[in-house]
Amino acid sequence: MTKIVRSKYKASRRLGVSLWGDGKDAFNTRNYRPGQHGQNAMIKTSDYGLHLKAKQRLKCHYGRVTEKQFRNLFVLAQKMKGNTGENFIGLLESRLDTVVYRMNIAPTIFAARQLVSHGHIKLNGKKADIASIRLKEGDVIAIKESVKQIPLIQESVSKQGQTTPGYLSFDVHSLTGKYLRVPALSDVPYPFEAEVHLVIELYSR
């Protein structure tokens, strides 16, 4: 098991939820904090602590998004018309690595980022190797021909039709997908309750 896999499962236990809904997640069998006294720990969480944990859960769900990137997206969401929380989620869900993950091209958000950074993904026919690229409605994603038979990709796309959200489309034969629209919070298949309002309150202080 890689260092990333070990640390991501620890994050689930530390934050008290299965962050990615992974059946292999240790949280499913040990739903208490990691460490010697994790099972018996009595922790009283402050109001600030609740807000912070909500932010950490949401941020961790998106993989290796830095705190600076996360906050900058919040600032941008504030400047946009409409509801800040909905705007914030829309921005997070329009990232290239997130879309690759949601389309089941990769089994995890970490693997999705790696596929992008290694140049294995095309955006509108051109190589795209920056995970934070924001997609627009109608943008088309494709897997490079040379890597279509990679077992990781083949195994992941075999799950199509089960969890691909409605704001995306994906063709399992051509291995191409389209970003159809900006999702609402209720559209996003989080495996835990995403308390976006608490994140907004935290960053608005």
From Swiss-Prot:
Endpoints of the signal sequence: none
SUPFAM superfamilies for this protein: Alpha-L RNA-binding motif
S4 RNA-binding domain location: 94-157
Domain of life: Bacteria
Keywords on record: Ribonucleoprotein, Ribosomal protein, RNA-binding, rRNA-binding
Record-level Gene Ontology MF annotations: rRNA binding; structural constituent of ribosome
Cellular compartments per GO CC: small ribosomal subunit
Pfam families: Ribosomal_S4, S4
Biological process according to GO: ribosomal small subunit biogenesis; translation
Function: One of the primary rRNA binding proteins, it binds directly to 16S rRNA where it nucleates assembly of the body of the 30S subunit. With S5 and S12 plays an important role in translational accuracy.
Subunit details: Part of the 30S ribosomal subunit. Contacts protein S5. The interaction surface between S4 and S5 is involved in control of translational fidelity.
Family to which the UniProt record says this protein belongs: Belongs to the universal ribosomal protein uS4 family.
Entries under HAMAP family matching the protein: Ribosomal_uS4_B
Name of the protein in question: Small ribosomal subunit protein uS4
Species annotation: Rickettsia akari (strain Hartford)
Chain's gene name: rpsD
